[in-house]
Amino acid sequence: YVCDCRENDTGLSACKAMIYLDSAATSFYKPEQVEQAVCRAFHTIGNAGRGAHAPTLEASRVLYRTRAKLAQLFHAENASRIAFTANVTQALNMAIDGLLHAGDHVVTTVCEHHSVLRPLYKKQENGVFLTIVSADENGTIDPQDVQNAMRENTRAIVMHHASNVTGNVFRPPIPSA
């Protein structure tokens, strides 16, 4: 989506050529394969685990096969540990809530989305130690700053890999186990 924002005589912006990078949250079009799979699911399968009739059993098989493929992709030992959520925000909230407990330490960055920072602040209110790493004037995070923020009780580093705001790709240090 391209748009050049210039004020018109009403004081409002008339967009003519701006590059809008937040496609993850607002993209309308999906790949054709996704559209076909959704339509097929609506018309041919039921709710997984909710009955013994053919459409429900097929839904359960699809769910099982999908979990198995994802477990293989991510080298997960147990496919039943793969969880599906409505969106990334819900997934992050679940992970943050389940992983961090009083006394734990977490590292994040000043560049993170509101949907990451809010649950981290809530955890901080409940005894989790939070370190927020700063960015430079270009929105770049120095990997050494992340490494330096880590402590003995660091349980997680919660941050994006690539920013749709700055276009920066972050290559974090990989801590040893």
What are these regions (language model features)?
Residues V2-A177:
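Pyridoxal 5′-phosphate
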